[in-house]
């Protein structure tokens, strides 16, 4: 039984009902509907911390989905899972792929910046201030892009950019 049919979460159930109605009204192919069902099940599994199941659903959605914009969100969510698992290099790969398909995805740009900032802090802890500065500059570059797309978001990043003289 698909996850969407066994979900007890009210919000997820509501989303599922609305999505099913939209899929019936809008002109979509069977393949698009199937891709969306896998994506929806992936989001549900991810929300419950079932990352292996979420990844399986996202990979199936990627196999079926042809629209670059829709694929960007699937890739972004795969990146989130890898970030949650501490697999930052893998997460970066997926975030880069997401923004390649959808350059207007500020949350992916933000997450890339967060990873570079984290790596910069690690470099400081290791006593490598030169590497830290390079990593912080990379973080700043991605945060500036994210802020350009979503000016009222990422307030903490905006403050950090001002504090460090990078804005």
Swiss-Prot record:
Subcellular location, principal: plastid
One example of a Gene Ontology biological process annotation: photosynthesis
Cellular compartments per GO CC: chloroplast thylakoid membrane
UniProtKB keywords: Chloroplast, Membrane, Photosynthesis, Plastid, Repeat, Thylakoid, TPR repeat
TPR repeat positions: 35-68, 72-105, 120-153
Pfam families registered for this protein in UniProt: TPR_1
Membrane topology term: Peripheral membrane protein
Domain of life: Eukaryota
SMART domains per UniProt: TPR (SM00028)
Subcellular localization: Plastid, Chloroplast thylakoid membrane
Function statement: Essential for the assembly of the photosystem I (PSI) complex. May act as a chaperone-like factor to guide the assembly of the PSI subunits.
Family: Belongs to the Ycf3 family.
Annotated HAMAP family: Ycf3
Name assigned to this protein: Photosystem I assembly protein Ycf3
Origin species: Chlorokybus atmophyticus (Soil alga)
Gene: ycf3
């Amino acid at each position: 039984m698909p996850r969407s049919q066994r979900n007890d979460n009210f919000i997820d159930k509501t989303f599922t009902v609305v999505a099913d109605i939209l899929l019936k009204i809008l002109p979509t192919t069977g393949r698009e509907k199937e891709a969306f069902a896998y994506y929806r099940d992936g989001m549900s599994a991810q929300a419950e911390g079932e990352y292996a199941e979420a990844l399986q659903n996202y990979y199936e959605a990627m196999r079926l989905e042809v629209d670059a914009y829709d694929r960007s969100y699937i890739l972004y969510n795969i990146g989130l899972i890898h970030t949650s698992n501490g697999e930052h290099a893998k997460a970066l790969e997926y975030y880069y792929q997401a923004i390649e398909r959808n350059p207007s995805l500020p949350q992916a740009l933000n997450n890339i910046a967060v990873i570079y900032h984290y790596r910069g802090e690690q470099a400081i802890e290791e006593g490598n201030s030169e590497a830290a500065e390079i990593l912080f500059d990379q973080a700043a570059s991605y945060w500036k892009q994210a802020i350009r797309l979503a000016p009222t978001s990422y307030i903490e990043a905006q403050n950090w950019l001002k504090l460090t003289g990078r804005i």
